[in-house]
C-alpha cells in the first residue's frame, strides 16, 4: 500500500495505538534498500515512479498543519510514526526532520511518542544514530539471524552486513525496540512473476536455523522490548503463511521465561520481566 501524502492518518496501529504517519520517501512511490518478500508496499521495482524526496521544510509544514488541525478537533495521537514507503533514514535530511518533529510534538501533543520504523541498515552512520537516540521509540528490524537468511526474507541492497547492524545496535545500550516479522513460505516454494530475482525460496521463522540464533541476538542486544508480529496484509510474494499469536508466543517463550526483555506479540504485550 503506497502512501499518497507525506503526513497521513492518524490510523490505528496494533502496536502503537493512534498513529500519525510521516512518509519521508516519494509520494506515490517507494525507495528502500530492502526488498522484503512481505512488504505491503510491494516490490521495489513497482514503486519508483517519483524519485523526489520530501524536504525537511515540506515535512515540517505538512506536519504542523496536520497537528494544528487534529489538536483543534480533539483527535488523540499516541504516536508520530516515521514509516511510509520504504526506509525513512534514506532521506538525507532525516536528522533535521527528527529535530523539527520533536519540537512540534512538544508544542501540540507533548504526551505523544515519536517512533521510527527502520531496517537498521544505516544505524552505523553517526548522524543517523544520533537522531534515532533522540526519539522515544527507535524500532529497529532484524527478521533473520544470518546474512544468508536475511537475503531470503529481506533481499537487501548489496553491502548489507548483519554483524555491522548488530554492532551498531549495541550502542543503544538496550534503549530501543527490536522488531521481527515471523512467517513461512508455503511448501517451500517462491511463487512470483517470471523474471523476479531467484526462482525458489524456503524460509520458516520457526525453523531451528532461525529461532535459536534469533533469540541469541535478543539476549546479546537486550532491547527494552522485542516486537514480534506476522503478516497482516497482502504481500508481493504469494504463498506466505502467517503465524498465529499462539505459535509466536511458543517460539519466544524462552526469552519471556528468562526475563530478558518485554515481548510484544501482535499487539498483545506479554510483560514477563
Summary of predicted features, one role per range:
Residues 24, 82-84, 180, 230:
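Short glycine-centered, acidic/aromatic-flanked micro-motifs in structured strand/loop junctions
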Residues 15-61:
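Canonical Radical SAM [4Fe-4S] cluster-binding loop centered on the CxxxCxxC motif
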Residues 244-273:
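Binuclear metal-ion centers of metallo-dependent hydrolases, dominated by the metallo-beta-lactamase
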Residues 1-6:
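Short, Gly/Pro- and small/polar-rich lid/capping loops
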Residues 61-83:
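Short Fe-S-cluster ligation motifs
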Residues 22, 61-68, 97-104:
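Short, well-ordered amphipathic alpha-helices
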Residues 90-241:
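Conserved AdoMet/S-adenosylmethionine-binding subsite of the radical SAM
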Amino acid at each position: 500500500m503506497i502512501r499518497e501524502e507525506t503526513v497521513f492518518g492518524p490510523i490505528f496501529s496494533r502496536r502503537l495505538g493512534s498513529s500519525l504517519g510521516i512518509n519521508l520517501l516519494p509520494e506515490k512511490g517507494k525507495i528502500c534498500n530492502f526488498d522484503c518478500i512481505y512488504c505491503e508496499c510491494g516490490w521495489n521495482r513497482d514503486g519508483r515512479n517519483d524519485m523526489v524526496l520530501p524536504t525537511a521544510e515540506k515535512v515540517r509544514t505538512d506536519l504542523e498543519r496536520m497537528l494544528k488541525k487534529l489538536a483543534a478537533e480533539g483527535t488523540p495521537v499516541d504516536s508520530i510514526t516515521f514509516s511510509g514507503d520504504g526506509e525513512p533514514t534514506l532521506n538525507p535530511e532525516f536528522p533535521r526532520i527528527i529535530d523539527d518533529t520533536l519540537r512540534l510534538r512538544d508544542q501540540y501533543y507533548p504526551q505523544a511518542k515519536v517512533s521510527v520504523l527502520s531496517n537498521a541498515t544505516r544505524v552505523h552512520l553517526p548522524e543517523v544514530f544520533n537522531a534515532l537516540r533522540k526519539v522515544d521509540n527507535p524500532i529497529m528490524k532484524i527478521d533473520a539471524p544470518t546474512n544468508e537468511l536475511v537475503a531470503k526474507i529481506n533481499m537487501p541492497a548489496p553491502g548489507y552486513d548483519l554483524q555491522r547492524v548488530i554492532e551498531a545496535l549495541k550502542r543503544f545500550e538496550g534503549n530501543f525496540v527490536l522488531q521481527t516479522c515471523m512467517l513461512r513460505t508455503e511448501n517451500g516454494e517462491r511463487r512470483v512473476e517470471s523474471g523476479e530475482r531467484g526462482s525458489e525460496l524456503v524460509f520458516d521463522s520457526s525453523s531451528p536455523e532461525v529461532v535459536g540464533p534469533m533469540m541469541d541476538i535478543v539476549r546479546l542486544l537486550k532491547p527494552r522490548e522485542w516486537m514480534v508480529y506476522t503478516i497482516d496484509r497482502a504481500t508481493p510474494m504469494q504463498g506466505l503463511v502467517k503465524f498465529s499469536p499462539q505459535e509466536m508466543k511458543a517460539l519466544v517463550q524462552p526469552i519471556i521465561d528468562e526475563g530478558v526483555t518485554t515481548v510484544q506479540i501482535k499487539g498483545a504485550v506479554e510483560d514477563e520481566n
